[in-house]
Regions:
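Phosphate/diphosphate ligand-binding glycine-rich loop within oxidoreductases
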Residues: 1-5, 97, 133, 139
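Glycine-rich NAD(P)-binding loop of Rossmann-like domains
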Residues: 1-20
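Amphipathic, non-transmembrane alpha-helical scaffold segments
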Residues: 14, 57, 146-150
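Aromatic pocket-lining residues of Rossmann-like dinucleotide-binding sites
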Residues: 24-25, 85
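Residues at the starts of beta-strands that form the adenosine-phosphate
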Residues: 30-31
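Rossmann-like adenosine-cofactor binding region
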Residues: 37-126, 141
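C-terminal helix-to-coil terminal segments
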Residues: 116-117, 123-173
Length: 173
């Protein structure tokens, strides 16, 4: 492996989670670059923003994905984007499985273009493949995370009752 201090982390999606990842990585000495439609106020780390993901990944040792699954983001990590990445880059996908084209990830790992692909969303096509690190999807399975979800639900309900605001809806346009 290599040290991460001084390396560049590119974050695709600087919402609440992406911003926290950026702050933590910066605290560990990483340089942060980003591409995001919206930047969450949690972001306190210095972050050079790129309008074009293909340009951003050219400078990244690591690329971390934190975007929702939308028509515009499905398959965004594909052979064309990977071709723009530094040789030996590492891709981290802890967001959604359909953001990557699995065949393109496997081909890039086999050719050495990518050094690693890390995910907690792997299906059987990716498990036990060389260069793939797969962990269980347990990020929200802590006591604190459950407490935070309950607190957020209460806050959102109160905001709706008191002000008519609907945020973070999964079924309201």
């Amino acid at each position: 492996g290599t040290e991460i201090e001084g390396k560049t982390l590119g974050i695709i999606g600087l919402g609440a989670i992406g911003a926290k990842v950026a702050n933590a990585a910066h605290a560990l000495g990483m340089n942060i670059v980003g591409n995001s439609v919206v930047v969450h106020p949690f972001l306190t780390a210095p972050c050079k923003m790129y309008d074009d993901v293909a340009e951003m990944v050219k400078v990244c040792d690591y690329v971390s994905i934190h975007v929702p699954s939308l028509p515009a983001t499905k398959g965004m990590i594909n052979k064309d984007l990977i071709a723009n990445m530094k040789d030996g880059a590492i891709v981290l996908n802890y967001a959604r499985p359909d953001l990557v084209v699995e065949e393109d990830i496997i081909a890039a790992l086999e050719s050495g273009k990518l050094r690693k692909y890390m995910t907690d969303l792997a299906d059987e096509n990716l498990i036990n493949k060389p260069g793939i690190v797969s962990t269980p999807h347990l990020g929200a399975s802590t006591k604190e995370a459950e407490d935070n979800c309950a607190s957020m639900a209460v806050d959102e309900l109160m905001d709706y009752i008191e002000n008519g605001n609907i945020r973070n809806s999964v079924n309201f346009p």
